[in-house]
Amino acid sequence: MIVVRKARVEDINLILEFEKKLYDNQVKITNKFSPQHNIDIALKSDYKEILFKYLKSMIYSKHGAIFISEFNNKPVGHMILSIQKSHPIFNMKYFGRINTVYINKEFRRRGISTRLKDEALKWFKSKNIKRVSLYVFPDNKHAIDVYKKWGLTSSIFEMRMTI
C-alpha cells in the first residue's frame, strides 16, 4: 500500500540519503550525456550541513513542504516543494516549484511518484497556487516521460557555457 505523508524533522537523515541517491544518479546521467555540465552540479564540501538546514527550514516553512512516500510502511521516496515569487512584471505573483522528486529505483513504476504529485498539487492548491514548474536535465529521459504523463509541458530551454 502506498502512503504519502508530510515529512517530519526526524525524517531529515532519510531525506539526505534520498537526495544523495538522486544526486549520484544525476552525476551518472551527466557523465554519460553531457560531462561539460558537471561543473554545474559539483557539491560543496559541507553540502550535508547546508542541505540539513535547508530541509529543516522546508519542513517548517509556510512556503515549502516535503512529502515522504511509503510503500508497505517503508519510506521509498520524497518530493520537495516550494512557492516562488514570479518576476515583478508578470500578473502571476507566485508559482509552485517541485524542487526534487526521488523514488528508490526498486520501487519505480508503481505509481508512487504520481501519488506524491497528487499530494503536491493538493498542497499547492491549498496555498492558492495556479501554476507549477520544475527543472529537469534534458538527458533524464525517464523523468521527462513521467512529468509529461503528469501533464507538464516544456516551457524554457536553458543553455549554459563556461567563460
PLM region descriptions:
Residues 24-54:
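Conserved GNAT-fold acetyl-CoA-binding loop/helix
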Residues 1-13, 17, 21, 28-37:
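Conserved N-terminal entry element of GNAT/NAT acetyltransferase domains
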Residues 82, 92-105, 157-160:
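Conserved acetyl-CoA binding element of GNAT-fold acetyltransferases
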Residues 124-135:
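Conserved GNAT acetyl-CoA-binding A-motif
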Residues 46-67, 97:
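A short helix-loop-beta-strand connector motif used in the catalytic cores of GNAT acetyltransferases and
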Residues 64-79:
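Conserved beta-hairpin
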Residues 114, 138-156, 161:
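Conserved active-site alpha-helix within GNAT-family acetyltransferase domains
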Residues 100-103, 109-122, 149:
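Conserved acetyl-CoA-binding loop-helix of GNAT-fold acetyltransferases
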